[in-house]
Regions:
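Generic beta-strand structural signal
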Residues: 95-97, 101-102, 113-115, 130-136, ...
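Double-stranded beta-helix
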Residues: 143-213
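Active-site region of the double-stranded beta-helix
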Residues: 95-97, 121, 136-147, 153-156
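Non-heme Fe(II)-dependent double-stranded beta-helix
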Residues: 1-18, 24-117, 122-125, 243, ...
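Short, charged/polar surface micro-motifs in flexible loops or helix N-caps
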Residues: 84, 94, 109-111, 141-143, ...
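Non-heme Fe(II)/2-oxoglutarate
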Residues: 45-57, 165-166, 202-207, 211-276
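A short beta-loop-beta micro-motif enriched in histidine and acidic residues
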Residues: 119-131, 193-194, 200, 223-224
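Short, conserved beta-strand element in jelly-roll/cupin
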Residues: 125-143, 199, 207, 231-234
Length: 276
């Protein structure tokens, strides 16, 4: 892999400290075109894990989907053959990277719904520290069209928050897990938290830890906002079907305690020793 894709010690340190880091100009035009084409195809003919939300005031529309890489060759190539697995290896300091799944978030103009504050890993049937997401937008991101917001350093709180539906009609209720906590009312007390967000351009990436608390505002602009995320895991992450995890992300090949290596969670990067 070219040295052009070696992340600086400063970038890795920011990720480890804050739980999120912005990577500028990392997705080239070829990959952006592939993402755009696949997203448009999914909007026209959604894949099997499509989900929509009831929007506020009856305006706008939210189009969501996941595990798209299993159905679109271009997205499979992006998830496996782009620089993302290599970035994950560096940020997680892992000698092995598995693809977990990918996810699409399209907010049409005037979709005012927030994506509620949450951390991701309680929704997922996996356990272990080295878990990361890379989120990119195919449209410029500003405060008007729903930027991602993060609470700095919240991945180190040691908190697993009970999964909840993101909007009415989004999905069935999540099972209650007695080991998880109810998330506090962050939105009504924003001044008590160290909240950060980022303006972005197409080609930029947000890398964030699976336990960092985050959400996003609605899209009050007149333009579409197309967000796409890919999730990866590092070494020693195991499969776990405790209450609360999303049923559509579970893997029939595995049993609790297994390493993730499987058709659904393939190994996409491997090296004989730790990257750093």
């Amino acid at each position: 892999m070219s040295n052009d894709f070696v992340l600086s010690r400063e970038i890795i340190s920011v990720f480890e400290k804050n739980g999120v880091v912005l990577l500028k100009n990392m997705i080239n035009n070829k990959w952006q075109r592939i993402l755009i084409d696949a997203i448009e195809e999914d909007i026209k003919k959604p894949g099997p894990f499509f989900h929509a939300y009831n929007t506020e005031e009856g305006k706008g529309n939210f189009h969501g989907n996941m595990r798209l890489w299993e159905h679109y060759q271009g997205l499979k190539d992006y998830c496996i053959n782009s620089t993302l697995p290599y970035f994950a290896a560096q940020l997680l300091n892992s000698n092995k990277i598995n693809l977990f799944y990918d996810q699409l978030f399209v907010k049409e103009p005037e979709t005012k719904n927030r994506i509620r504050w949450h951390n991701d890993q309680p929704y997922w049937p996996i356990r272990g520290w080295p878990v990361i997401s890379f989120w990119t937008s195919l449209d410029p991101i500003s405060k008007e069209n729903g930027p991602m917001e993060f609470i700095r350093k919240s991945h180190k709180w040691g908190k697993w928050y009970q999964p909840e539906n993101f909007a009415p009609g989004a999905s069935k209720a999540y099972e209650k897990n007695p080991e998880f906590e109810k998330i506090p009312d962050i939105e009504s007390n924003r001044d008590k938290y160290d909240i950060i967000s980022f303006d972005m351009n197409p080609g930029d990436l947000l890398a964030f830890h699976a336990l960092v608390v985050h959400g996003s505002a609605g899209n009050i602009s007149k333009d579409r906002r197309r967000g796409y995320a890919v999730r990866y895991t590092g070494k020693d992450v195991i499969y776990c079907t405790e209450k609360g995890s999303h049923l559509d992300l579970r893997n029939p090949e595995l049993k609790d305690g297994d390493l993730l290596d499987s058709k659904q969670y393939p190994v996409v990067w491997e090296k004989g020793e730790n990257f750093l």
